[in-house]
Amino acid sequence: MSLCMKPDISVSFLNKTMSSPLVLASGVLGLTADSMKRVLEAGAGAVTTKSFSMDPRKGHPCPSILPYDGGLLNAVGLSNPGVAEMNKEIRKLQTQHNGLIFASVFGRTPEEFGSAAASAAESEPDLIEVNVSCPNVESEFGTPFGASFRDVEKITTIVKKAAGSIPVSIKLTIHCPSISKMARVCEESGADAVTAINTVGPGMLVDTGVMKPVLANKVGGVSGPAIFPLALKAVWEITGTVRLPVIATGGVTTTDHALQMIMAGAALVSIGSAVYYEELDVFSKINKGLTDWMTERKIGNLQEIRGKAHE
Amino acid sequence: MSDKMKTYPVVDVKTHHPEMKSYYFRQIEEQILPGQFFNLWLPGVDEKPFSVSDVYQGIMEITIKAVGPFTRAFMNVKRGDRIGIRGPFGRGFTMHQHSLLIGGGMGIVPLRYLARNLREKGFHFEVILGGRTEKDIPFTTEFSEWAPTTLVTEDGSLGYLGLVTQHIHEIIGRSKLSHIYSSGPEGMLVRVMEEASGRGLDYEISFERYMKCGIGICGQCVVDGSGIRLCKEGPVLNREEAEKVTEWGMVHRDGAGRRERED
């Protein structure tokens, strides 16, 4: 690149252009159009809705989200007002901002995943993200769908068919026999991308005053800086195994974290818990951090460093 | 600010009447602004946000009325019981001279601590408080001692018969007040906003929405029209902020995030 040229942090993802590789992760500020619009205005290239199901869900009582020393613990219990409401919010947001919108969906059965995806496709989001890996909700066999190759294969196939022309990303968990093999299953079942990783655990905290678990659900998914190395390794392993683009998420809080994810091969980098640590400024801070780093290293485009940690 | 969960013993309980009690705790943070709130966890039940009714001589007071399952369960809390407390959260009221405090029902609670702060600064203020009956208006004694106070009840059991909003006009006109603070049922707040805007007065209003995390990440309390997170940028909004919001008096969201019509 010529010295006077400003580095370009825009990225191409599934044939669409994003102004930044940063994505708002599912579960944070993703309930309404106005909430997500604010995050796009803060510098995210895309936003992911909170996970929606066909029917409304009340979720767990509170406390349902708690900070601890290394991150956040949450057992919101997938509360949501139903996909029909999500579609209204997505339609509204599309008229207000041209940032990308990823719709996160889940179901209690593979068939419900299919109907939620079919319904979500009606609002034409840029991507449907399939939450097969929330640690707070289990399949009828008592394990998250994301732990079983057969369940993930089945759900991916059903959702891909239901989503029609809308691309599909499967959100994976590290709590499975092999996350790279799981990504391979997604690829072979027709997924367009994978998102890695969901929260880890579940974990728990006890209040020593009353000697009881503090989350109403007792246990909850662990996120935040503590899980970054786990997420990075998962992304690195997946991108070394499949050709699918990876939306990397898990504890990304700083520019350095985002760079590490891209060097491990991530197409996009999602940010969730860091909104707690760094406020909404986290998006503009990391955008600027990436630009500054690229300027210093004379790198014109993020494609130049993507996957470098594999070489 | 303490975001993490920690339990503290209740140091005292005051019964206003069987369905309204004040709970006292050691002051857990140096600076607590009027209008800010704490999330209170009743172990085994739930966690809900409550604004501070007073901070005085190292003790903070939270006043609760039994209106739902959580607050009814709270009425059984005794001195020595441990309650989880996180906070203080959100933005509180700022201090202004020559103000009118307009409170309705349990919305009166944060105004009580505000009144203490205004009084300590030596600022002039007046107060108008309303409730369904005499029992629904807390802290009438303190308010009446501290400032000219007008009381209004819907059944006429205390003060004037009627609604608070029928008297605001006259008080503002008579006393040349320039700033309004308000907290209470949303129908009342909407009328207060209209009245203040009509007169070109600045105001700060404490709003209420279903909250979960208290730390600005879950998105549950984001209000339409603005993207304002009420737990973080609120619960007290000034005129410029409040006027951006399009849902006041019309809709709010339940625990699932469903929009419900405002009563």
Model features per residue range: what roles?
Chain B
Residues 69-212:
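FNR/FR-type flavoprotein reductase catalytic core
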Residues 46-53, 90-97, 101, 231:
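Short, Lys/Arg- and Gly-enriched loop/turn segments at beta-strand edges
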Residues 186, 208-235:
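Local cysteine-cluster metal-coordination motifs and their immediate loop/turn environment
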Residues 2-79:
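Ferredoxin-reductase
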Residues 224, 228-233, 237-263:
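Short Fe-S-cluster ligation motifs
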Residues 12, 54, 151-153, 205, ...:
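Structural signal for conserved beta-strand scaffold positions within catalytic alpha/beta enzyme cores
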